[in-house]
Amino acid sequence: MYIYESLDFKTCHLIRPINLCNVVYKLISKTIANRFKAILPHIIFENQSALISDRLIIDNVLVVFELIHYINHKNVGVDGYMVAKLDMSKAFDRVEWCFIKRVMEKLGFSSKWINLVMRCISLISYSVIINGAACGNIIPTRGFQQGDPLSPTLFLICIEGLSALIYRAARNQCFTGISICSDCPRVTHLLFTDDNILFYKASAGESRELRYILQKYEEASG
């Protein structure tokens, strides 16, 4: 099934697919998602506050407000800062399956568990109903199903790839982030599922580093 995001029906990119999963698959998918919930707080970086138990998304919102307030009122020193807001368009539809598999391997999941998850997301197919009759058999090669209980969890795991790239750049002093005082930790980015807020020094070098990070993540994730 498809729904429209707006009243403008002329553009195809505004059409969202809604998958109709059978009951047995939804039970399996929900069970796997519940098993994930117990370990997500231990494997997902703390800058991701959405869809994680014992974390509130309002915490990241308050941190963003405080940092932007600091930037707007900063009048000491020569360094300026920049804030970039990223919105991943059709994020669920474009993720490469091999990428989620590699990320789960890096996070230490067993091969048996990874194979179970991959079977859930790869053994699917679609049909097109024309004049009331189902036609064709479309087999996707990327993306997560909209409405699948497992999809949000898998997307959080995929975003860890982006966080890992940013933290590696921060360790190499290529992407320094922002700190409001000497005793505070430096903040490089905050995540709200597929919406990201990045903080970095207003310099050509760090802007190039950010572009490099996003290009590498795009190439890997699709």
Where are these predicted regions, by residue range?
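Nucleotidyl polymerases of mobile genetic elements and RNA viruses
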Residues: 1-222
